[in-house]
Amino acid sequence: MTNDTVSDMLTRVRNANLAKHQVVQVPATKMTKSIAHVLLEEGFIESIEEVGLDINRQLLLSLKYKGREREPVINALKRISRPGLRVYANRKELPRVLGGLGIAVISTSKGVLTDTKARTQGLGGEVLCYIW
């Protein structure tokens, strides 16, 4: 088990995307579940399924591809805040990823949200990652 489950999740999704896998398996924690639900709401993945027993719970994420060439919907994932260097932003400093084409995943007091939802609710928080 790794200490940084968010980085582990992003790396697994990135590698599965590059290898054009249909499904990727990530450890199920509260944070990875929340990030997976944000990815599902934003249309980056097709579905989420939780499998396994209590201690070994896993999330199965169905990745999304477009066209005949099976181009990945997720072009890149970038971890921003990490255990060694936390990055926080208040509501006025929330980042825009690629001028609004991508999303920033923010951990707020109201849960894990995208940058646009956090901005409309007037919330700041920890900037977890960028996805475009």
From Swiss-Prot:
Note the InterPro entries from the entry. Ribosomal_uS8, Ribosomal_uS8_CS, Ribosomal_uS8_sf
Q: Does this entry carry the keyword Nucleotide-binding?
A: no
Subcellular localization(s) per the UniProt record: Plastid, Chloroplast
One Gene Ontology cellular component annotation held by this UniProt entry: ribonucleoprotein complex
Q: Write the record's keywords in alphabetical order, separated by commas.
A: Chloroplast, Plastid, Ribonucleoprotein, Ribosomal protein, RNA-binding, rRNA-binding
GO terms assigned for molecular function: rRNA binding; structural constituent of ribosome
Q: Has UniProt tagged this entry with the keyword Nucleotide-binding? A: no
Superkingdom of the source species = Eukaryota
**Pfam families for this protein:** Ribosomal_S8
HAMAP family from the UniProt entry: Ribosomal_uS8_B
Subunit details for this protein?
Part of the 30S ribosomal subunit.
Q: Which family does it belong to?
A: Belongs to the universal ribosomal protein uS8 family.
What is the role of the protein in this entry?
A: One of the primary rRNA binding proteins, it binds directly to 16S rRNA central domain where it helps coordinate assembly of the platform of the 30S subunit.
Q: What is this protein called?
A: Small ribosomal subunit protein uS8c
